[in-house]
């Protein structure tokens, strides 16, 4: 999860998030090199006194500063397209869980476990225990297995929401009347936090998401939910 004064991304808990972090570093390096080059050119222009009134054109330079940015954009676009494909790929998920957004809570439905349905509300500050996170804890966590592809079917009952867990690299819109899906494979057990990432009304800031990831063998023993 995030930490105070954290500057980077959260630690990855899925292969897709690992790819996103790698792409972030790749794009940031390209941006840094371009910025340094532009700053060097500006500094040289401001400090030099040399002029040449005989130069009317420089076709070689024009070709270079046209082709070079195009190459840089291609090098950035190719890994971006690959990650975009990975996020949309659905390949034989082991479990399907449905998430329904409401104003302002989430409903989860485990279709593979007899249609188990429960709501997940944010815990008010009066019900928090020492060490709990304000505005992030819920009464019922969504329990998910690790090391198995899980498909999340996401929709909304009223307005536009967005189901997001940054450490898993997940952000899928919950659209009324439409069923969106995303597939992920978690790699580490733990408790991970997210929030609705689409402004959905007065209490938009008070509908957190808490995913508890447990080993697959424990998950397969049956529902382990505390309701």
UniProtKB/Swiss-Prot annotation:
It comes from the Eukaryota. It catalyses: 4 Fe(II)-[cytochrome c] + O2 + 8 H(+)(in) = 4 Fe(III)-[cytochrome c] + 2 H2O + 4 H(+)(out). Its cofactor is Cu cation. Residues 1-14, 88-227 are mitochondrial intermembrane. It is found in: Mitochondrion inner membrane. The keyword Metal-binding applies. The lineage of its organism: Eukaryota, Metazoa, Chordata, Craniata, Vertebrata. Cu cation A2 binds at residues 196, 198, 200, 204. It comes from Cercocebus galeritus (Tana river mangabey). Binds a dinuclear copper A center per subunit. Component of the cytochrome c oxidase, the last enzyme in the mitochondrial electron transport chain which drives oxidative phosphorylation. The respiratory chain contains 3 multisubunit complexes succinate dehydrogenase (complex II, CII), ubiquinol-cytochrome c oxidoreductase (cytochrome b-c1 complex, complex III, CIII) and cytochrome c oxidase (complex IV, CIV), that cooperate to transfer electrons derived from NADH and succinate to molecular oxygen, creating an electrochemical gradient over the inner membrane that drives transmembrane transport and the ATP synthase. Its main location: mitochondrion. Belongs to the cytochrome c oxidase subunit 2 family. Its EC number is 7.1.1.9. This is Cytochrome c oxidase subunit 2.
